[in-house]
C-alpha cells in the first residue's frame, strides 16, 4: 500500500482558464507552477491559484480523476467543482453536529 496522499488538483490561471494535474504535495506543486517551473501551460498564465483538489489513496486513482476531468467541457468542470464543494460543505456541517 502506498503511504503518501495523492492529489488531483485544479488551478485557476490569471486568464481565468483552468489547469488540472496530479501531485503528492499540493503546496510544493503550487509554488512550482507560480515560479514558472511548472507545466508549460501555466508558465504564461501566472499567477495561478489552487481552485480545487481531491485526495486519493493511490496515484492511479488521482490520475484517473485527472484524465476524466480533462475530457469534460468547461461547463461540466465548473458544475462538478461546485457540486463537490457543496457536498464537502454538507459533510463538514454534519460532522460538526455529531
Swiss-Prot record:
By its UniProt entry, which CDD domains does this protein fall under? GIY-YIG_UPF0213 (cd10456)
**InterPro entries in UniProt:** GIY-YIG_endonuc, GIY-YIG_endonuc_sf, UPF0213_domain
Where does the record place the GIY-YIG domain? 4-79
Organism of provenance: Bacillus pumilus (strain SAFR-032)
Task: Name the PROSITE patterns on file.
Answer: GIY_YIG
Q: What is this protein called?
A: UPF0213 protein BPUM_0019
Describe the family membership recorded for this protein in Swiss-Prot or TrEMBL.
Belongs to the UPF0213 family.
Amino acid at each position: 500500500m502506498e503511504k503518501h496522499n495523492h492529489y488531483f488538483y485544479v488551478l485557476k490561471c490569471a486568464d481565468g482558464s483552468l489547469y488540472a494535474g496530479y501531485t503528492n504535495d499540493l503546496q510544493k506543486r503550487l509554488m512550482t507552477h507560480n515560479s514558472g517551473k511548472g507545466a508549460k501551460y501555466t508558465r504564461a498564465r501566472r499567477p495561478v491559484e489552487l481552485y480545487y483538489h481531491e485526495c486519493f489513496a493511490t496515484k492511479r486513482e488521482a490520475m484517473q480523476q485527472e484524465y476524466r476531468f480533462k475530457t469534460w467541457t468547461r461547463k461540466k468542470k465548473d458544475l462538478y467543482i461546485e457540486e463537490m464543494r457543496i457536498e464537502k460543505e454538507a459533510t463538514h456541517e454534519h460532522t460538526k453536529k455529531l
